[in-house]
């Protein structure tokens, strides 16, 4: 793989504009190559010289010079070449002169008088610009993580004091304990010098389990530097040992418990309890309660904060390494093209720069590792490093095979189903309408689920193809996000079992042996639905447990809106539910059909119940009400008026859906429906559809920008073909108005009414799948524009001084 592709594949996608523009520098080198080819014609082809083969063959009998050359065995030619190159650099004969100024790195090209020198001068100017830009960005990010490190230091002080308070509520007698520890350090200073000479370093380190959590942060004792000191020479003077012992004992003192007087528990209002307390302005909401439950919550929050902070450090380390490597590669290409030796002096300056010498960052990484292992992994290095550096998932061949196998099963079952319906009369014509009004809504639920999962898998495929960091956008834990193969496997598996149930149902209808067990025949879709629900909530580690629980958590947040803090996965799932209104109605029909015993006689008496009719309004409006409440909470917390307008969009949709439901019920139960209800349903639906379409294009997709360099689109596009965006907008409008069928009562003669409703619902799901890609693409480009590659993590403690700054 060429380095340009390797760089683009390994870079942090949200920082892609901050990396060195390697392709642009290569274009400058290509211009130099073109100039060289014009001025210097290619050399004539090489012809073999008589005796050349013999002389080359004679070299096979020379004495072996060794794999590693010693100074005495170096050849004279290499010594002369090394000497000449050193002279070139030392005497100023190098082609460039690199210096450091207040504006950054500046390179003076010393051979502009040569032919084509102006092209090389432009190359080095652009190279300096790229380096200074990269180093400036790197400095800013390092300063940010250093500020975060200071904040984490304060959080660790508070955590240790909190831990001491919980595990020793009576108190330790801090002043007396300090005096005793100081006196003890003085008494054992002399004996320590003798013991240290004969005791290994690992044995000298005190490691009582009871005090492992109580001592102050002394992770530096585990660093390589101190290990080297332990294996070095033994101190000879007693005074040195006494001083080191005093410092060690002073560092081993417990954290000052007075820290707890200056902190408060950070109430993020992320749960219903904290939200209700925040609304009621409870005076005790920030009071610290010292118990084991609060300690565990604080440790979990701080543990998550350390994991995210460590990921920041790793990304910065990768950023530094890739950019330094890019400068090295491009300079080697320059040397090869121009036959100069400019890379040595330039890379020497790069290595000595802030970007090249990342010692401060490396020490911080080691410090974070040792701190995390000690305080959050109980001293187990492997356990701690597995949390800090989760292993990347490998694509398994059995997943690909299972996906293809299940897809083949679906295709075969569909062919078999069509053949059975066409060739065998499974039921009389009179029972066909009853079957479509009862069993079809039950089985269509699985069709909606499979179609939505398939559309999501297609989205994942194209997100990966265009390098959209969807895992970061959705907040997935590293290594737990599903690929499109895994998602397709889930969807095709559900589809296979659903089609098996349909075929089983039809077979039991015509089989004389099973025809008497009609209630059992009707229960097949219910069994499948219950099985899917059981698998979804099963706590065992199989079938993507983390993803299942992540989905259930987001679903709970949608149902309990606005009590939970709204995150992108929550409102993204809420938008998906707005496209599954027909599926929610199917679930409502499940409750009615099986709860009231209609399945025993295959009768649909649900529509005769007022409770069921009212539930249709609630079920159809529930997803939009959830999104409305989420928008209201975001408007209050973020003080964003756009969220208020977004809430108006969902309010209009709730009104439109309710009026369409009422009109559909009136059409079904009365011969002459009132015209004013039709007008209200149609006008409200048109108003809501126009508002939603405008919001999709402008806010969710970021399109229709007149001033953009891509007219009527946006400045940055991941798909190079602009026509794709215009086609998507047209399709979105067409599919958005698919609900017109419910108002105009337009029906196809060859389709049953339930089939028509299923087709319209499927079109809405397909529109949502298309919407998903461009919505996440726009979110990714916003992250790229703001260089946002990290998640903001709430910390468990607030210091009084921080509150004063906020005030």
UniProtKB/Swiss-Prot annotation:
Main location: membrane
InterPro entries found in the cross-reference section: EXS_C, PHO1_SPX, SPX_dom
UniProt xrefs under PROSITE patterns: EXS, SPX
Induction and repression of expression: Not induced by Pi deficiency.
Region (Disordered): 219-248
Annotated organism of origin: Arabidopsis thaliana
Location in the cell: Cell membrane
Cytoplasmic side: 1-400, 459-485, 544-678, 745-807
Record protein name field: Phosphate transporter PHO1 homolog 2
Keyword Repeat carried by entry: no
Role noted for this protein: May transport inorganic phosphate (Pi).
Membrane topology term: Multi-pass membrane protein
Keyword Membrane: yes
GO cellular component, one term: plasma membrane
A GO BP annotation: phosphate ion transport
